Structures are given as C-alpha cells and as structure tokens.
Amino acid sequence: MNPVSLIFLAFAMSTDAFAAAIGKGSSLDRPRLSEALRTGIIFGVIEAITPLVGWLLGQAASQFVADWDHWIAFVLLVLLGLHMIHNGLRADHATEQEKPGQHSFWILAVTALATSIDALAVGVGLAFVDVNIFLAAGAIGLATMTMVTLGTMLGRALGAVTGKRAEMVGGVVLILVGATILYEHLSAA
C-alpha cells in the first residue's frame, strides 16, 4: 500500500470517531484542550488496536466480521445516543444541573470501540495486502487522535450554542453515525 493510500485510509477510518467526538464535546461544560487530548488519545489508541486485532483474526473470521460489524456498531451507538438523549431530557427538568467537565473513561472507550468496528474489518482486509500493519495501525490511530481532538473542541463551540440540549444533540449525532454505518453496509450488500 502506498503512503497516499495509507493516509486516505487513516483519515477515512477516523470520520465516525470525529462525528462522535463532536457529540461528546458538545455535551461537556467547556472542555479544555487537555480533555480534548484525553478523548483523542483514548479514541486513537482503540482505533489503532482494532485493525491489529482484525489483522490477527485473518480471513477465517472475516465473514463473521463482515456480516455483523455494522449491526454491532449500530446497536452500541444507538444505545449510547439514547442514553445521552435521556440525560439531556432529564436535564431539562432539573434545576441548574451542570454539564460534566469530562466523560468517564468507560463511556469514551465504549464509544471509541463502537466507532472503530469498521477498522477491525479493515484490519482483516489488510492481512491480504502488502502493508506494514504496525505502520497502518499507527497512522489510523494518529489520524483518529487528531480528528477526535479537533472534533471535541468543535463540539465545545456547538455546545455553547445549543445550551441544555447539547447532550441531546450529541445523542442524535451518535444515532446518526450508527444509522449511517448500518445503511452503508446494507446498501453495499
């Protein structure tokens, strides 16, 4: 795989995570750069690990992954999105409920895993092409870290505009990302 293709692959793998990061950033109370970097690192590490795991699974598991990856991502993202919408609705009835300063590690890790399932499938495919898997995984992780950090900060700006509804907007974004993943896989079949 040539370097230009690798760069395009890395950024393509980061787009779902970028969209999710916008939602996550909008649901926080003015996230600082350190929180955006923390979010980016968590997403980047997970996004770098998943193609390695996929590569190790090889062709034997590729049919299972190809058949179910979109459903797994869809369900996880919809559940996380509904949870965020529920929290946003609950915040409307609470008096002076504050947004969190940061999301828990586990919420970020599950979101990152849900948005990186496609990278798992890509990793399986990379097992059959001439590519340094460690270089590819590193490029995917670095691109994702960068895009998620930027997405979190962009979400911060959107959160200031949307006010109390920011978490609901973030939930809708996650559901739309999940629906897009499902649609793309079903329409390609």
Curated annotation (Swiss-Prot):
Which compartments is it annotated to reside in?
Cell inner membrane
Provide the Gene Ontology terms for cellular component: plasma membrane
Q: What UniProt keywords apply to this chain's record, in alphabetical order?
A: Cell inner membrane, Cell membrane, Ion transport, Manganese, Membrane, Transmembrane, Transmembrane helix, Transport
Any one biological process term the GO annotation gives: intracellular manganese ion homeostasis
Any one GO molecular-function label of the UniProt entry: manganese ion transmembrane transporter activity
Q: What is its main location?
A: membrane
- Annotated membrane topology: Multi-pass membrane protein
Ranges annotated as spanning the membrane = 3-23, 41-61, 65-85, 106-128, 141-161, 168-188
Give a single Pfam family match. Answer: Mntp
Job of this protein: Probably functions as a manganese efflux pump.
* PANTHER family documented for this protein: MANGANESE EFFLUX PUMP MNTP-RELATED
Concerning its family, UniProt says: Belongs to the MntP (TC 9.B.29) family.
> Know the name of this protein?
Putative manganese efflux pump MntP
Species the sequence originates in:
Pseudomonas aeruginosa (strain ATCC 15692 / DSM 22644 / CIP 104116 / JCM 14847 / LMG 12228 / 1C / PRS 101 / PAO1)
